[in-house]
Amino acid sequence: MRPFLDDAKRRVDRRLSASKQSISTSRLLPSVLPDRFKDNHDAQVDFTAPPGGVGSREGHMQYMQQSIFSMIAAVGSRSDFHARFDESSDSDGETEGRSQTESPVKKVLGSSNPVNSQTEQRSGSQTSRKSEKDQSSRGRHHRRTISDHKFLRPFKTSSKPEPDTEPSTGDERLRVTLPRRPRSTTPRAAPILSRMVEAQAQFDSKTPSAGRSQNSSQESSIHSSHESSTSPLSTRLMEMFDFNKPEKVLVEYACSLLQSMLLQGYMYVTEGHICFYAYLPRKSTVAIKSGYLHKRGRKNPKYNRYWFSLKGDVLSYYADPSNLYFPSGHVDLRYGISASLAESKEKGREPKEFQVSTDQRTYHFRADSSVSAKEWVKALQKVIFRTHNEGDSVKVSFPIENIIDIEESPMMDFADTFKIRVVEDDDSYAIDEYFFSFFDSGREALTLLKSLVNENASGHSSRTLSPHADRSPRSDRTRRSRNRWSLTSGTSQPGNGSADTHRKRSASTSHLSLGPDAIPTSPVTRHQDPSESILNSFEQGTESSAVWQSMEDGAESASQILHRSDVFQSPTIHNLDKRACSDERSGRRQAGGTARSTLTHVNANKDGSPGEYSKLGNDGKPDREIRHVIHELDQETQGPSKPGPGAPTLNELVKAGTYPLQRAAGFAEYLRTRSKQMSNLLASESMGYIEKVSGMWVGGRRHYGEAEDVLPDDQAVDPEDKEDGCNYGDRFRAHFALPSTEKLQATYFAYLHRVLPLYGKIYISQKKLCFRSLIPGTRTKMILPLKDVENVEKEKGFRFGYQGLVIIIRGHEELFFEFRTSDARDDCAVTLHQHLESVKYLAESGLLAEQEKDESEAAMAEHRMLQEARLDDYGENDIPPLNESSGLHPIFDDPRASIVNFKPAESLRITCLTIGSRGDVQPYIALCKGLLAEGHKPKIATHAEFEPWVRRHGIDFAPVDGDPAELMRICVENGMFTYSFLKEASQKFRGWIDDLLSSAWASCQDSDLLIESPSAMAGIHIAEALRIPYFRAFTMPWSRTRAYPHAFAVPEHKMGGAYNYITYVMFDNVFWKAIAGQVNRWRKNELGLKATTLDKMQPNKVPFLYNYSPSVVPPPLDYPDWIRITGYWFLNEGVDWTPPVDLSAFIQRAREDDKKIVYIGFGSIVVSDPSALTRTVIESVQKADVRCILSKGWSDRLGDPSSAKTEVPLPPEIFQIQAAPHDWLFAQVDAAVHHGGAGTTGASLRAGIPTIIKPFFGDQFFFGSRIEDLGVGICMKKLNVSVFSRALWEATHSERMIIRARDLGAKIRDEDGVATAIQAIYRDLEHAKTLAQQRSIASSTPFSPTPSAKNTAEQGDDDVEDSEEWTFVGDDNEMDMSRRMRDRAISDAEMLPDRLLTNSIHGAGR
């Protein structure tokens, strides 16, 4: 891939100074900053410190930030805090797969002549564009080569000068190298053949253009007695199936080719051929199916339960579905042979067991039901079929004259199926059988085909099956070009002849014919001897096959003209297994595609002259000699070949035996690496045991070039390891079942910290970060896509003398690595950052590699051009198109979509309950406006001071008691858990809670649905009493996860998943203990409900709506289905706002002076020295040379009316405002500086500008850490001139930060958070109703004040109603997963609560 061509050179250059570089992706290097921004004497001073006696964040509770919610948790009187962990509450959920959508492709149809221009581009321009890296790209990628017409040129391109005999232009090479193929024969159901190869017909340079591109899917029959033989459809079929001339299309049907699965496509009947075409687009990064299965061990008959995910060509399984980066193992379906249900052990019962066979072993699985087992088998069969298919489309073609007979073969009640038997060719006498199923017009098709066969038989009565019979010129050409390849489930074997002739063949009883693109051929396979069956007994891993394994692949095409039906049943490629790889070209494939045998290509032109070779043998003979050999071989092929199965191994051993004495060690290494037992013991690494172990423990690092060899300036490599043929990249890809397009870039030895330090090896490739444990007895593997990595940070190690590296991942807990030396750690960090920058902006099309994207485009173009030709025929001949309803109807099986309309039929009365500041109310106004538009009747219940604002938007209002300003004053002025805080809060707070609960109960009457911020505390109990569905909504993380810490417990440094999870457990328990007494008394006296506990409430089962962007806080992998991150709920009040004239003039003047503009506003905060903070802001703005719009709100006491006044005069660079809508203001500035509240952060990020956050309390620390992790801003721990001026300069000059912020802003603006939230409400409404009913049945009493309480209780089961300890429990699997996560979190962090309360986490951990 082009972006990585110079990675090796850049990496070497940068690695030399790695230890001196800054590692933050969002910050500029110190060397880039001007000298004036170096730290001064005030670098450690914080001018935002609160007044004396209150203390700073460091002086008080370091983690429980100053907020109303923390205050609530702190002042519950007579609460037994020592017992806060005696009661537990479960959190569970399952992982939802994320898919990437495939972007539409149109560029391949851009030329005026789609046929010729595309042909020339693929053969000429793309050939020159490919790097030499493609020469070594073998294995899996060529299997995916699809209809991009690469058959017009050799797939292997080179930047080296061409030999004199090679045509200099792409057109000449096209004409000389590629003689035409007339037609193709097809399959028969034989046992195992190695793999399916593509053969796509070449395009003639004189072929007329097809014109426009059309997308149509039509599935019935077309009859045309007037159709011209040169119609667009005839021409297109001639090009695709390589006929001699355009053949008149007699009829067209929508049908399915029946093999292990129904392959839906089209049958075209021409004058001389029957053709079948199917388009099979693939998306390799989409999870096809996932779920729980039981897997049997290799030796242990016991079944163990795992979470399985089928993605691309790999079936992976995981012990924990929330840890999808750490697979327990995988089954590589590229080596798959079959997937089938096991035989039922009981008569009359369908089996739940099934098995998957590969070329190495058979895997046994058990599903939870027989239906599930069938679904898995069907999905696996599709994947195995795709891996056998050489691209994104399948073609089958055979001459009508070769048809023996056609007979009906009833298989399905709803379709007509018949079998066509075809003689493969005139030499082999092989007979193939094809089954075609017609869902419409089947009887008509059968009659027509039988009549054609009968007419052909009567017209050619002299035709025989004898290979010695007279044949027409076309027949002769067909004979010479048909069986150019024989493929086997084993490997290629040399033919019978001297080594000088370079004759290689692959042994098989089955033939797959390549199209004209598949240039390498094996001429000695024209005739097959019965002794060839001996060759089939060679296993892939044996010496005879491994020695002569050749991985030169031929030119590829996008689709296949298949020969013989057994191609559907053999493995695509064969395991690298315990043998030395030849080099990168070996991949894990056998001759010809794995199985492509490589040597010389014998192509016969029409006049019988030998064609030009496409690929050299291993020795690479010159043109002239190869031509001579080809000519000789072409002469030999007129008679039967004489394969010698014993010769290959003997010749190889003789050759090895003639090595000089100094090469004896190499021969011994050759034998040693082929020992299966030793290879298993040494983890398939082909190096000596002593060297392996010593190198492993010494550690270090290695970088690899384009050919995946160690760069010369890296650490010395063992000479024997160099001479050993096995490529480093091959072993890397074999370890993790990765495609051949994944190139190894660097490796490091390090410790992965999870529960215990685990020593292993880090692999960095173009798109993956992988880890493999090296400790005996451990099998930990990690595969992490770099696109999921947000940032990389250097930290101190957990152990003395070690250096730490933290990987921050989207929606997942952080990963910690430890290195022995700082050099290795710094080098790894720099390498990762280089790859992150490359990967971050690569277009994600849903495909694994750029080659696959090109190939998919070409296959799609071929499909569209064929559809276009059909439409052209319709226009010319007035033939009705295929009936849309005649063929197979697609089955709706997309788990991410739904055909069900979840919107309630009637209008709902929806109440939104919240408390707090203006920022807590604003999102609900936006949501209620959306609900009004949907026809519902929303109401907001909050503090009375917000009533005018709410009613101005046409939303109903209900008051809730409590003064938010007084609560905020207690939090801000007293700090957290100080003596003055506890004293004042205990005096005022308890009465406030009683008033809040009672007023909330009154405000929520007459509601059908309740949506509440969990800070309001009353909603879940009110919904239980009213028997109505209940949702939660909030602006910060409140649900348990290992990905992020609780918003009120953000640590100074990353602490990992165990810490993150335990913060939620702690806060839930402490918060509930503080209010439990008052809440239960209120439930009994006013709601008529029984007392409850945290476990009985099951708050983690409640549907939750988070109103921030999934691009800012990606959904964690361990969130259950009912927790949804919807996007911001913006109100957009600035649309009609008119700015003051002086503000507009200030902005205009700054633009004219070419100065950057920043906004600075921290809200209403309390600081010890307001004038010092003002001077700091002024000096920082002047030092950074920017213009500032200032919104001042700080003072030495909360609510001070003079807080907006400046203590010192403001310079002309600063313009002060009182208020302005954020959505308007942030669009006018280049950067924003604020306190980091959820709403303000969302507004600045939506504007697409870098954001600087100075957090003070609450969730502000969480959002500060998020913008820094995303690389779109800076979070300042202290505020002084040195730090602030540098941050202002970076935010306005760092192109990396500016681009990232701009891209993030575009993503946020594309979201519609309100609409997504409303759809989520509809979707989860039934789930919420179920929860409400279950809770009300369990907790209602005869004194319940709600009219429906008794009736509902009577409907419930008496046992459940009377149960005091009833607890709603969901799916067992869910609960098991929750329990495992909780147990792991608690065991991982036994002492963490004490550390949390003693301010010593960082010191104890590092």
UniProtKB/Swiss-Prot annotation:
Bilayer topology annotation: Peripheral membrane protein
Positions with biased composition (Basic and acidic residues): 468-478, 576-587, 1376-1387
Record's catalysed reaction(s): a sterol + UDP-alpha-D-glucose = a sterol 3-beta-D-glucoside + UDP + H(+); ergosterol + UDP-alpha-D-glucose = ergosteryl 3-beta-D-glucoside + UDP + H(+)
UniProt biased composition (Polar residues): 110-128, 490-499, 531-548, 1397-1406
Start-end of Acidic residues biased regions: 1355-1375
GO function term, MF aspect, one: sterol 3-beta-glucosyltransferase activity
UniProt entry keywords in alphabetical sequence: Autophagy, Cytoplasm, Glycosyltransferase, Lipid biosynthesis, Lipid metabolism, Membrane, Protein transport, Repeat, Steroid biosynthesis, Steroid metabolism, Sterol biosynthesis, Sterol metabolism, Transferase, Transport
Binding site for UDP-alpha-D-glucose: S917, R918, D920, A1220, H1222, H1235, G1239, T1240, D1259, Q1260
Main localization of the protein described in the UniProt heading: cytoplasm
Domain PH: 286-385
GO BP field: autophagy; carbohydrate metabolic process; lipid glycosylation; protein transport; sterol biosynthetic process
Transmembrane segment boundaries: none
Region (Disordered): 83-231, 457-558, 576-622, 1334-1406
Free-text function comment from the UniProt entry: Sterol glycosyltransferase responsible for the glycosylation of ergosterol to form ergosterol-glucoside.
Protein name (database record): Sterol 3-beta-glucosyltransferase
Organism listed in the record: Aspergillus clavatus (strain ATCC 1007 / CBS 513.65 / DSM 816 / NCTC 3887 / NRRL 1 / QM 1276 / 107)
Underlying gene: atg26
